[in-house]
Amino acid sequence: MGISRTLSKLIMRSPIDFHGAVCQLGNQNIRFNSKQLMQDAEEVYFSIKSKTNFKRGVVASELYFNALGFNQVESIDISSNDKPSFIEDLGEDISNTKLINNFDLVFDGGTLEHIFNPDKALNNIKKMLKLNGHIIHQVPCNNQLEHGFFQFSPSYLNKFYEENNFLVKEILLICVGPPKLDDFMRVNVYVYDKEEVFRMHSKGINLPSTFLLMHFVAQKIAEDKLVIPKVDIQAEFSKMENQSKNIGYEKTNFLKSFFKSTFPNIWRKMGILKAVISRYSSTLYDRVTGHNLKKLGKF
């Protein structure tokens, strides 16, 4: 659990209200100092709410969130190692009434993947938030084998929150570099586009990244009972995969077009090679040109 300079900049530019009470899922390790925070805030046009002076480390998390504008900073963890405000197992129903409907922001900086019952944890987050409160998840998407129990697809969080009366405000994909180096280097951040990600998957296209993180922001807009979404994700994938094969097929099938127009007589005699070129030229084009996700920038 930790907040790098990249992740901090994404927090500061998040579409949330920076006031009131925040609860961290695990006491966050702040991987920069207050001087660097001031520099990063200026870069993303964020107004620091209070002067602060802190060094790197877990002890800085309260001062960090104070500087963002929160006057009450709490944390919850399963053990006392990092001195959390509350000791609770988020994989079970939380029992402390001080946690219910008490927070304007719940921040998950890499805890959800370590909880064996993530659906239970998400329900606890829902209960902890005040009406109109926000959740921010910064969790692994890809290439973090054995970092925790899970890596999350955006569809998982998106589906849960949409069906439980939350407004999903932002989903970003963060191309994180090698461990420990991401504190010193800027990384590419992309806006999540479900249809484009399905197309990339069907074409074997990946984002160039050692690790892939997700930055997810949603707002609680109504109170309701827990809903566990039921969806045939495989059927949805197959449908979108077929759509991706048809979108711009003639445009991307450049080898076929080239041969037909340049060597029409040879093309008519090519037999089975015509089918091979028609089948794979579009895929080759996609592999060369890569993805079409919107790049938010380097952070």
Model-identified regions with their sequence ranges:
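Short "lid" loop at the C-terminus of a central beta-strand within the Rossmann-like core
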Residues: 28-30, 140-145, 173-178
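Short, charged low-complexity linker/loop segments at the C-terminal edge of domains
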Residues: 221-245
